[in-house]
Amino acid sequence: MRTTIRYAAVLSIMILAGFAASGAAQAPAAPATTTPTAPASTVPAVPMQWVAAMYNMQGGGTTWVTLHADGFSSPAQVQALKDLLKDQGQTAVVNQLNGMPQIGWVRFGKQTGYPIPVIRYIPTATGYRIVAVCARPIGFVGAVTQGIIETDYPNGVVTLDVKTKGNSAGQVLPAVKLEFNEDGTFDPKVYGTAPLRLMQVREESAK
């Protein structure tokens, strides 16, 4: 049975990092889910690359994941996508993402990489966060997207929380539906029963 689950943590990530422009006009997130941010700083030079071990919470072993960025999306670019979603719906956003240039990719094991048109770099109090939005679902062996209808859950998301000290981690959300609540709050719905955990996250030399 297919199940749609809402994750509060995912909602916080997407509102704060993926689909909210920095600045005014955004409702403040609840204290329990807000990630403290560091003062604004210059976006680092690209290319950048990270590697992580992906653990399937439902079993299925470990896969090494590589995320590569040749550029980062600006708050204005992300706000434009948010406005498009609110005004014209998910299909319009998907069409826009498919027409945008690729600024990165994510690869699972030795499989062909998934192109990424949107990557956000957000400084935090403990390091920085990366939110990468794919133009299509992430369907790899063992993922929860098997048999999914791409028109309903058309985007995949990869997040990394990279810390200057301590362990860094992240998540893979193989398939996400883009929606707003009645109050205008962005409310993504995740297909499947659980996200896929990323552990042992570290930067590596970009090739």
Regions found by a protein language model. Give the residues of each.
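Positively charged n-region of N-terminal signal peptides that target proteins for export
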Residues: 1-6
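Bacterial N-terminal signal peptides
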Residues: 8-18
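Ubiquitous "structural anchor" signal
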Residues: 17-20, 97
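Boundary at the C-terminal end of the N-terminal hydrophobic targeting segment
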Residues: 20-29
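Long, low-hydrophobicity ectodomains and other hydrophilic envelope-associated domains
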Residues: 34-207
